[in-house]
């Protein structure tokens, strides 16, 4: 499962194993200064918007890859059901990152602390 962490002043979305192939993408790195909000959601599927292009998807099972629409682009790394972290960005290739995490609350809290968001 993908991991969100902070390394050298950047937010990094580490994709593991097959996720890189499923999402047609490598790790994503953005400056911490580009993070405008971090929140936890119970239903990551409700957060997905636009069409998947490119990526892999099967409703309620997996959504990994770029999502495109009038809003621009989001990147999703969603597996199964359960909590996720939604990171809203500005001035980067992606408008949002949507990532499932068993410990979504702790991940979001850590990211908020690193970015100075409350």
Please provide the spans of the model-predicted regions:
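Conserved beta-hairpin
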Residues: 1-32, 36-39
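Acidic, Ser/Thr- and proline-rich intrinsically disordered linker/docking segments
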Residues: 23-29, 36-118
């Amino acid at each position: 499962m993908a991991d969100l962490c902070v390394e050298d002043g950047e937010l990094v979305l580490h994709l593991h194993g097959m996720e890189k192939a499923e999402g047609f993408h490598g790790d994503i790195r953005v400056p911490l200064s580009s993070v405008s909000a971090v929140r936890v959601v119970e239903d990551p599927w409700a957060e997905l918007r636009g069409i998947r292009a490119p990526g892999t998807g099967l409703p309620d099972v997996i959504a990994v890859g770029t999502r495109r629409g009038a809003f621009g682009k989001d990147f999703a790394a969603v597996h199964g059901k359960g909590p996720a972290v939604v990171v809203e960005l500005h001035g980067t290739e992606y408008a949002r990152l949507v990532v499932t995490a068993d410990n979504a609350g702790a991940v979001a809290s850590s990211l908020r602390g690193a970015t100075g968001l409350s």
